[in-house]
Amino acid sequence: MSRVNKLHQWKERLRDRARTVSFGRFLWRRFLDDRLFQAAASLAYTTVFALVPLAIVVFGVLSAFPAFNEWKDALTDFIFNNFVPGAARSVQNYLNRSLEDLGKFTVAGMVALVASLLITLHSIEQTFNSIWRVAAARPKVTRFLIYWTVLTLGTMLAAASMAMAAYVFALPLFRTTEGQWLAEFAWRLAPMAVEFVCIVLIYRVVPQHVVRLRHALPGALLAVILMEIVKWGFGFYLGNFQTYQRIYGALSALPILLLWIYLSWVSVLLGASLASSMSAFRYQPEAMRLPPGFEIYGLLRLLGRFRQARVHGDGLDEDRILALEPMLTDTLMQELLCELKRIRLLRRDERGQWLLARDLDVVPLAELYENCQLRVPIEDRPLPCRDDAYGQAAAAALEQLRQPLRSVLAQPVGDLYTHLPGDPP
C-alpha cells in the first residue's frame, strides 16, 4: 500500500465517528486496567535505589574506553541540567562521591548494588510486559544480555553523540551570528530529542512483544509532551513555593527527586499504554464480534489455522493471526496463545512466529477444556465467519459438546434433591 493510500486510510478512520468513540473507550479501559499510577510509584522507589549502581555501570563503561573519558563529566552535567529539577541537583554531588568511593565498597556491597539494579530492570520489564499483555517473560540469560546491551551501547552512543555534536558545533559555520543562533536552538531542542529517541527505543526493546514503530512513535510523542509539561509545572511550583525546602531543609532533594522520578514514570507509562492500545485496538462491527462466553469457538478456529499452516510447513505471527481471525481481539489472542504455550501445544520460534508443538490428532478435546478453562455455551448465538470451513468445523464441534448438556441443564435445580431424606425436625 502506498503512503498516499495509507494517509487516505487514516483520514477515513478519523472521520469514522463510531471507530473514534470505540477507540476512546478502549483506550480509557486500558488506562484503568493497567493501573499505571501504582506501577509508576513502585518503579520510582526501585529507581531511586538503582541510581548508584546504574551510574557505576554507565561510567564504568566509559572508563573502559579512554576516548570517552573526557566526556563523563559533560554527560553527567547534560543529564542533571536538562532532566533533573534544580532543587534536586545536589544529588549529583552525592552520586559523584559514591563513584569516588567505589574502591572502598566491599564485595557484599557491590553484590547488593548490582542486585538492586537487576531488580529495577526486571520490574521495568514486568511493567511493560503487563502493559502489552505479555504473560511469558524472556529467559533469564536473554534478559540479562538485553539489559547489558542496552546499558553499554546506550552509554557509548550517548557519549559518541555528545562528541560528534561538539565537533559539529565547532565548525566555522557555527561561529557566525546565524550559526550561533542555530547551535543554541539545537542545544535547546536536544533534551527533547534525546527523550523521544530513548523512549521509542524503550518501547521497542523492553517488552517481550513486537512493537511497531508506527505505534511506538505516537506513544513516545505523548510521553515527551507529558514530561515537558511536568518539567514546566515542576519548575513553576518549586520556583514559587518553597514548602519542600522549608519542611525538609537540606534533605529536600530526596523527596523532590522521588516525586520527579514518579511523574517521569507516569509520563513514560501513559505513552506506553497509548502505544499498546494502538497495536491492540481493532474496530469490529457488530456482526464480527465474538459473543461473550464463546471464546472456545475462537480457540477451535485458531487451532484450525495452525493445523493448516503446519501442512504448508509454516507458522503464524500475531499480525497474520489477527488478519485471518477478525473476531479475535488482541487481548483474547494473547490469552489464547499464552494458554496454548503453557500446555505445550504451541511454541514460538526465533522469528517470533507461533508453531504447533504437538500433533492435533493426538490431543483430546478434554485437555483443551480442562487446561484452558473455557466454558461450553448452551445458547445458540450468531457467530462471525460461521459459514467458512473453519467456522463450520468449530461450530460442529461446539454443537457436539453442548448437545448432551442441554437436557441435563434444562431440569429444575430442585429435582437434584428429590432423593434426599426429609429435613430434620
UniProtKB/Swiss-Prot annotation:
Belongs to the UPF0761 family. The chain crosses the membrane at residues 48-68, 105-125, 154-174, 182-202, 216-236, 250-270. GO terms for cellular component: plasma membrane. It is found in: Cell inner membrane. It is a multi-pass membrane protein. Disulfide bonds: none annotated. PANTHER family: INNER MEMBRANE PROTEIN YHJD (PTHR30213), UPF0761 MEMBRANE PROTEIN YIHY (PTHR30213:SF0). This is UPF0761 membrane protein XCV0968. InterPro entries: UPF0761_bac, Virul_fac_BrkB. Keywords: Cell inner membrane, Cell membrane, Membrane, Transmembrane, Transmembrane helix.
